[in-house]
Amino acid sequence: MKLCLTFLLVLMILASVTGEKLSEQTLRRAARKNKGPRCWVGRVHCTYHKDCCPSVCCFKGRCKPQSWGCWSGPT
């Protein structure tokens, strides 16, 4: 029984010394930062609808919400 508890204690100490928890936090932070390209409505100059995010379209050279009435020109 004492040997088992000692073994568990050693494993816990090794996990804290090797920075296992730190690396998990680092991976979580990196995953939060890497969300892919961001699209800005109204700021992006566009020529075609595909130049904008899926939820917006190209309207008069700018990416605008689809509620503005996207024209059915080049996609």
Curated annotation (Swiss-Prot):
It comes from the Eukaryota. GO terms for cellular component: extracellular region. Expressed by the venom duct. InterPro entries: Conotoxin-I_CS, Toxin_19. GO terms for molecular function: sodium channel regulator activity; toxin activity. It comes from Conus radiatus (Rayed cone). It is found in: Secreted. This is Iota-conotoxin-like R11.3.
